[in-house]
Amino acid sequence: NPSSMWRHSSIKTLAINYAQTATAPDFHMWVQCALHQMKFANLPEPLLFYRIHQGQASKIHDKISESIQYSMELWISHLFPELTPKEVSLLSLILHGKSIKLRTEEFEIAFSAYDKVRSNNETSLFGEDRETMFSILDAHTQFLKKLLYQRTQ
């Protein structure tokens, strides 16, 4: 990511496998760093500027979405180990998907999975601020529930 800086040695020691995330390696790298409890900081000032062109990786939307889905599932499965693989997959889809194509039953499973993990917002596993994380996720899931139930009525 052009606005990120780190010591090469700190990332290299993680031996990250990018095979499943070739088109969104930066997102996968951040998930791996978090899983290894690396420290992050946001700096308010831009450190570099770059030009945008049609050939860059961010223009390949489907492949990027697949890579992000893979990394989201990895992250969610570690954040909430009590979820089944299906719950992890569906929850990650509703949390990151721009265009969500699920059946009503799948939405119900995802919402149920979210309700299950929402009750355990006290224990931070990787230094994440669970209060802030859940406030954002609450708003998002409530919005999706409202849309779904308006559509099905």
Enumerate the language-model features and the residues they cover.
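Conserved nucleotide-sugar donor-binding catalytic segment
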Residues: 1-74, 82-90
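Membrane-interface aromatic/basic loop that binds lipid-linked glycans or pyrophosphate carriers
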Residues: 74-79, 93-153
